[in-house]
């Protein structure tokens, strides 16, 4: 985003996702730790809020003060051509589909669990943290090169149909 390069967003970016701030996660976790009714049960600890991937990436771009150059690419294309990156499980099996959680189970055991950090605020905080901590900004030239190849392939496909 900072360099104005295309940002690959799987599919059309409209699937819903949830991001839970660590402070909000901690409220749920601590509430379950000493609760005997939690023993032997599985819980997910998430916010009730959802955003599309388009909204998530736009929020990050806004926090950076940069325009989002979104490049929507079919998830199965990314999975097939992921090379060294396993997009099958994480993308096709998880992030490409809308995920909205029912938090009623944890709220029965931890009734005061209220997520107070919105997804947008959490994303802005994360961006600011990363900008102020250069050690978190680890370049990955191999992944950048792969993303460039995907962007180039999409541009070639577009040009092939524009010629008609």
Give a label for each model feature.
Residues 4, 35-36, 109, 129-133:
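Generic structural signal for alpha-helix termini and adjacent loop/cap motifs
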Residues 10-33, 40-41, 55, 121:
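Substrate-positioning beta->alpha
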Residues 114:
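Basic, glycine-/proline-tolerant helical and adjacent loop/strand elements
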Residues 16, 95-98:
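Glycine/small-residue-rich pyrophosphate-binding loop that anchors the diphosphate of NDP-sugar donors
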Residues 117-164:
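Amphipathic terminal alpha-helices
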Residues 20, 51, 101, 117-118:
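Residue-level signal for the nucleotide or nucleotide-sugar donor/cofactor binding architecture
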Residues 3-10:
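A short, charged helix-loop
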Residues 31-91, 103, 108-109, 125, ...:
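Mid/C-terminal beta-alpha module of Rossmann-like enzyme folds, strongest
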């Amino acid at each position: 985003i900072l360099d104005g390069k295309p940002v690959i967003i799987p599919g059309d970016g409209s699937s819903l996702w949830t991001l839970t701030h660590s402070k909000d996660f901690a409220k749920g976790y601590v509430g379950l730790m000493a609760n005997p009714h939690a023993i032997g049960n599985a819980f997910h600890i998430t916010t009730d809020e959802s955003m599309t991937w388009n909204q998530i990436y736009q929020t990050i771009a806004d926090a950076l003060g940069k325009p989002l150059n979104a490049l929507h690419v079919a998830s199965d294309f990314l999975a097939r051509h992921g090379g060294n990156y396993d997009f099958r499980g994480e993308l096709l099996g998880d992030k490409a589909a809308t995920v909205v959680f029912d938090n009623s189970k944890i709220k029965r055991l931890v009734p005061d669990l209220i997520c107070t950090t919105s997804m947008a605020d959490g994303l802005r905080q994360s961006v600011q943290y990363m900008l102020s901590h250069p050690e978190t900004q680890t370049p990955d030239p191999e992944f950048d090169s792969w993303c460039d190849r995907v962007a180039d392939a999409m541009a070639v496909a577009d040009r092939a149909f524009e010629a008609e």
